[in-house]
Amino acid sequence: MNTTHATPGEQSLHTTKSVDGLSRTLTKGLTAGVAAGLIVLVPVLILQLARGIGVVPEMQLAASSLMGMAAYEGAAGLILGTLLHFFVSIVPALAYGLVASRLPVVNRLAWIAGPVLGLIVFFFMGIVVLPHSAFTTPASVSPMPYVAALLIHMFALGLPISLIIRRR
C-alpha cells in the first residue's frame, strides 16, 4: 500500500489556503448580502412611498413575523425589522458564495443564477418562514403586491448577490 503523507509544513500551507479561501468566500458573501440588502431598499422605498406607506411600516412588517402586532408600536419593530431584512439578504448571500466557490459554473451563469436565487428566497420566505411566524399587518399597512415583491427578490436581491460574488 502506497500512502503519501504531507509534511507538517505542507499540511499547514494547505490549511492556511483553505482558511484563506473560506475567509474570502465569507467576506464576499457578507459584502454581497449587505449590498443587496441596501439595493433592495431602493425599489421597496419607491414602491411603498408611491402607495403612501413608507419604508418604516415595511420594516415593521418584517418584525411582525416575530413580534406580531407589537412590531407596529415604537422603535423596536423598526430596529428588529431592519435586522431581519439584512439577515434575509446576508444568509442567502453566504450560502450562494459557498456554492459558487465549489461550483464555478454558478459564477459563469451569474445573470441566471442570481434571479434564481431571488426566486428561491422569495418562495422559501412565503412557503416556509411566513406561515410559521406571527406575521400580521394592521389595516393601514398592506403588503407589497406579489409580482412586485417577486421581481424585487429576483433582480434587487438575487442578481446583485450573484454579480458581487462573481467579481474576482
Model-found features: residue ranges?
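Internal alpha-helical transmembrane segments of multi-pass membrane proteins
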Residues: 27-29, 101-124
